Regions:
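Bacterial N-terminal signal peptides
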Residues: 4-15
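Acidic, glycine/proline-rich Ca2+-coordinating loop motifs
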Residues: 16-166
């Protein structure tokens, strides 16, 4: 009886799953981020680890924006490119790169991020963990951030892999 129930559930799952088709709409909607892990042939441990993403309403317009963590050049890296974390502003389902305007284009080897209103001013702040110095961005409430890492004592010069606000 148990075996026939499991087979029945699995067949329903396959029948239902056949109707789903996923299309990559990221380019059409303006999300053009591609993560680069450093790409050396040295097989550094850090190259095997992915990076974080934050869903953050940084501009208080009641829709979620996206902050992507990016890799960074490692020793013996032969690419001639500048990598930085990216912030994409959600504008009714169309995404605009707001990294430069917001001032959150950290160029360290970022691993993770967390967002929360740390200073209770109604604006969501952003913490980025890095292979190297972590960064804390205070949201200024006008679409921009200020790096206040030193002022708040965010002193982790080694390797921060993840973070969370409670």
């Amino acid at each position: 009886m148990l075996r026939s129930s499991i087979i029945y559930i699995l067949s329903i799952t396959f029948v239902v799953a056949e109707g789903f088709i996923f299309n990559d709409e990221s380019d059409a909607q303006g999300v053009t981020f591609v993560h680069d892990h450093g790409g050396t042939d040295q097989r550094y441990y850090i190259e095997t680890i992915g990076a974080g993403v934050c869903l953050i309403d940084y501009d208080n317009d009641n829709d979620l924006d996206i902050y992507f963590c990016q890799g960074s050049p490692l020793p013996r890296w032969d690419k001639d490119v500048i990598l930085e974390n990216k912030l994409f502003r959600n504008d009714n389902g169309q995404w605009k790169d707001a990294t430069s305007l917001a001032g959150v284009g950290d160029r360290s080897y970022s691993m993770g991020c967390a967002c929360g209103d740390v200073d209770n001013d109604g604006d969501v702040d952003l913490y980025v963990t890095n292979y190297g110095q972590d960064v804390f961005y205070r949201n200024d409430g006008d679409g921009t951030f200020t790096d206040v890492s030193k002022e708040v004592g965010a002193n982790n010069p080694l390797w921060g892999a993840s973070s969370a606000f409670f």
